[in-house]
């Protein structure tokens, strides 16, 4: 059932009926990024927007504010008790005061305790995605689902490659020094070649294009994509006026 995670978790607390399936192994989620992104006002935990995206009537932050919705993902993890959880957000969260450390600690204190490895920023382009997209990833393991050796290794400051839960980069980025065990980045041209022409499709969505004006290099609005490089970050709201010339 779709709905606000706040409303779903609150209803569970009120009537005790678990809305989630049993025996969940993995919970994944991306809590709202607007209050952490360098493209926004960066209000972080002090966001005055509600979980519905509206201005709070009192005008003050609360546990239901948009900037604190990771706490409700935390509630879902506490309810479902998955063996593993993965959360993601924008890179800007990392350098917004001690926000990253606070979120890591809050995730560690779920129920009987989760082992949360240090969050890490991953670049999509280093994994063969033709897009310049960086996201910070949080990973946590339910302690009773791990062997003692795994707990010991995952608790170290420098985790051995065998136990490191983060994937290894497979591609090197544009302008980076080529590496023997990595493949060249996937360019926009390589990803799009072979696609049919928009006018050959019966889907109106394939023929629509933006008429917005170029807004300068300070943002990605109406910029022309470098076909031999990586595309800018594709945004979740499906706009941003990114132009690919044919």
Functional labels for PLM-detected ranges:
Residues 1-6:
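SAM cofactor-binding core of SAM-dependent methyltransferases
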Residues 8-24, 34, 38-227:
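Class I S-adenosyl-L-methionine
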Residues 31:
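Glycine-rich, N-terminal phosphate-binding loop of Rossmann-like dinucleotide-binding domains
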């Amino acid at each position: 059932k779709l709905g606000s995670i706040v409303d779903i978790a609150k209803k569970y607390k009120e009537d005790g009926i678990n809305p989630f399936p049993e025996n969940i192994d993995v919970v994944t989620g991306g809590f709202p990024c607007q209050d952490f992104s360098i493209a926004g006002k960066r209000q972080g935990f002090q966001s005055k927007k509600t979980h519905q995206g509206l201005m709070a009537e009192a005008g003050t932050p609360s546990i239901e504010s948009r900037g604190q919705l990771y706490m409700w993902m935390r509630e879902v993890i506490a309810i479902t008790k998955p063996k593993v959880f993965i959360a993601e957000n924008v890179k800007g969260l990392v350098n917004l005061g001690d926000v990253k450390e606070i979120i890591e600690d809050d995730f560690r204190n779920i129920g009987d305790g989760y082992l949360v490895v240090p969050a890490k920023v991953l670049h999509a382009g280093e994994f063969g995605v033709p897009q310049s997209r960086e996201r910070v990833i949080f990973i946590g393991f339910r302690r009773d689902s791990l062997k003692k050796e795994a707990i010991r290794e995952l608790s170290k400051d420098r985790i051995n490659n065998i136990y490191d839960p983060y994937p290894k980069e497979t591609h090197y980025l544009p302008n980076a020094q080529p590496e023997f065990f990595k493949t060249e980045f996937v360019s926009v041209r390589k990803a799009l070649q072979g696609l049919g022409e928009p006018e050959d499709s019966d889907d109106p969505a394939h023929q629509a294009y933006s008429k917005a004006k170029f807004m300068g290099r300070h943002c990605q609005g109406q910029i022309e994509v470098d076909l031999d490089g990586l595309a800018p970050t594709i945004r979740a709201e499906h706009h941003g006026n990114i132009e690919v010339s044919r």
